[in-house]
């Protein structure tokens, strides 16, 4: 085997140097995307990390004077886009990248843009509660801005059909993903506000990645939602998905189905409420009627208690009680006199003097006659007084007056009508006659002028 010339034989150091020069000279600066791993930041301030994909990895370094210009904090697992120079570390023969700049890539970039726009709009006050419009209750017509072929529209219509089938729905079809989506959503919002045919709007779509939801993180869409004269309910993605549209909308719904729930009335619940109100009204009416019935019964009882016949009956009962007490008093006096008579007679019989007995008998007869005369006289007086009282009472009875051809007229309040100034045309009157009542209505009132005193003639 022949030996090559010494000029063609590489030492290790020469090889590594040659490779480094080739890499740096031929490759120059490149753009590289990958996932950060093994990230470290020692006290020197330099960054050391590895970029990898599913099949390979490469070491990277970013020096302190360069990484201080980076606008985010790198972390393991983050996708980044790096502008770097390729070089080789000669002592070990390891090649690596020297990063000159770094920015998030994929969802990382979108997340950074999301946070920046969120902070900007928040600083401008677009998220403030003072600008939130209340939702109409109930909504007369609902507008839906979403894809005409998406699952979100199907879910919204299904919920509205179940809860409130009579609620009209206007669909403003638009793309919800892709480069044209923000402009189409913008035009749909403008059309809905210009036509003003709805009183609330649902803006949304189904779930997806951060890139899929990018249209609802667009600044133009956010400002259009904020400027909408119609209340807007955002319904983007699933409950865990959060977009800029959620912050500027008047109300955020976690899902499209939930948005439909928020803007619609539950007819079954309304029916239950109506039935409950009807039941309460019926109970109130029953209570009111019961109160009125009790009041009527009390008034009727009081009226019956004041009836003239009842008053006469009570007075007659009182007179009979007095007469019975009078009779009892007379009988008591008679019994007492009889007992005294028997006692005296017994003593006289015991003493048996005939003369005294005769005188006593005569005196007794005289006393008995006087007592009988006195009792008769007193009974006659009491009876005459009773008859006189009955006659006076009967003469004062309103029924007696009615029997003589007179009548009593009362107004609708039960007050006795005595003068024409108590009445007005149209008043209802009740006239009591001897054998019944007459209901009438005042049609004309004629007042008799007062008579003037006659002047004396000189």
UniProtKB/Swiss-Prot annotation:
InterPro entries: Exonuc_VII_L, Exonuc_VII_lsu_C, OB-fold_nuc-bd_dom. Its main location: cytoplasm. Its EC number is 3.1.11.6. GO terms for biological process: DNA catabolic process. CDD domains: ExoVII_LU_OBF (cd04489). Keywords: Cytoplasm, Exonuclease, Hydrolase, Nuclease. GO terms for molecular function: exodeoxyribonuclease VII activity; nucleic acid binding. Pfam families: Exonuc_VII_L, tRNA_anti_2. It is found in: Cytoplasm. The keyword Protein biosynthesis does not apply. GO terms for cellular component: cytoplasm; exodeoxyribonuclease VII complex. It is an enzyme of class 3 (hydrolase). It comes from the Bacteria. It catalyses: Exonucleolytic cleavage in either 5'- to 3'- or 3'- to 5'-direction to yield nucleoside 5'-phosphates. Bidirectionally degrades single-stranded DNA into large acid-insoluble oligonucleotides, which are then degraded further into small acid-soluble oligonucleotides. Belongs to the XseA family. Heterooligomer composed of large and small subunits. PANTHER family: EXODEOXYRIBONUCLEASE 7 LARGE SUBUNIT (PTHR30008:SF0). This is Exodeoxyribonuclease 7 large subunit. It comes from Sodalis glossinidius (strain morsitans). The gene is xseA.
